[in-house]
């Protein structure tokens, strides 16, 4: 019976394929990919919805987007009278169409919608929610995922992604909508009057906030290469740099045009060195010093540096975080009660740097919304000078409540330009940080363990650390084990336990005098990540042995 219903369901979807907006994507998929769309459902989680295009409730299409929008409309109307919302969208396939569908559904429920006529960055959406004082915001993007993906992120009135409680409530409203093929969305002129043009003044205000933050970029002979990886950071980043009288940059022209197919990049992820391939070619031709890339929705940023001999140094997210924190400490020396915020899997290096400079630090769960929650709870006398995640997400000033590569681009250029005046580089500055607080190094191992056996393996690893906490790992004495699922810390050196004041998450962190390792399974994929952050000899060898010991 169940198989018959599934077949009927598939036939109904195929009958509506011409109206789905995704027929072309569906026809290009394998039989397995097509079947997955009918055998699963998209779920609205803490980061919204992200998935492939295709037919069925497990894929993004006109009907599943209408279901999402209708659920969100009911959620917003239940929260407040006369809600308002701003929608932004990136350059991906169907981002514009999805934005219009969502706007129409929300307008149909008397929700005022601010909708731009062109693509925007994620940090601009966060800023716009705060600037326009709207009830919520929606960003249509799938960050650096492949070209056949898209997604919807929902933001609250503070410009941060919805809290866990709010996203769970919104999810219930979405699920109550039922079958997406049964939704009827009447459109009338009266309803479309709720859709308003997005004010240009908001973009101007965003630019002014960054200009005020930067002040000026000192004149040096620093040369920069920039790539948007076909994403949204062009034209806003070049316009911003020019407004700061910095013109010593070259764009990777082929990659600085919006392209939903990401035609000229092997990877649209600034964490991946391959994302810099064309930037390196241009840097070698133009003798550039600094290479910068942003991901497609411009919330994350990667950098590399070219020396006089043409050697390229790539900086990981923790190293960029350390450099930016170091610079922000220098810039804010006149402030008291300074605070830095980072995720629990980010480096010991930045914590050591903060301690050395008498800067308070706080650690939060992974996900920038947790950083935003800390910012929201700041006392009046506290000054947040920097926040970051090791996954290349940074924030210098909190007029935005999400990762913001747009504000970081001119900041890192200003830093590099100042260093160039003294004949120094970012690599030199990082080495100085190591000499000051110690050579804390970091690496990440990501394991995909498919199938039932893979799931059991992941559960077994986490259970082992919980029930049989190791006394030492590769000669490193364990001080404590933090379990964010039980909200407990077991202090092995004292044989005591204490509580963690944090939302629950399936993460275990093992602490040593030399640093930590952390284990974090994915909640949606058959993956588990091992983070290693240590100050020790032969770091690479030690990290590899720890990885082999856990996953052998």
Swiss-Prot record:
EC number: 5.4.2.2
Enzymatic reactions: alpha-D-glucose 1-phosphate = alpha-D-glucose 6-phosphate
InterPro entries: A-D-PHexomutase_a/b/a-I, A-D-PHexomutase_a/b/a-I/II/III, A-D-PHexomutase_a/b/a-II, A-D-PHexomutase_a/b/a-III, A-D-PHexomutase_C, A-D-PHexomutase_C_sf, A-D-PHexomutase_CS, Alpha-D-phosphohexomutase_SF
Binding site for Mg(2+): 143, 295, 297, 299
Required cofactor names: Mg(2+)
GO MF term (any one): phosphoglucomutase activity
Catalytic residues in the record: 143
GO biological process: enterobacterial common antigen biosynthetic process; glucose metabolic process; purine ribonucleoside salvage
Gene3D superfamilies given in the database record: Alpha-D-Glucose-1,6-Bisphosphate, subunit A, domain 3, Alpha-D-phosphohexomutase, C-terminal domain
Name of the top EC class for this enzyme: isomerase
Keyword list, A-Z: Carbohydrate metabolism, Glucose metabolism, Isomerase, Magnesium, Metal-binding, Phosphoprotein
Pathway in which the depicted protein is active: Glycolipid metabolism; diglucosyl-diacylglycerol biosynthesis
Free-text cofactor note: Binds 1 Mg(2+) ion per subunit.
PANTHER family: PHOSPHOGLUCOMUTASE 2B-RELATED (PTHR45745:SF1), PHOSPHOMANNOMUTASE 45A (PTHR45745)
Similarity comment: Belongs to the phosphohexose mutase family.
Protein name as annotated: Phosphoglucomutase
Record organism: Staphylococcus aureus (strain MSSA476)
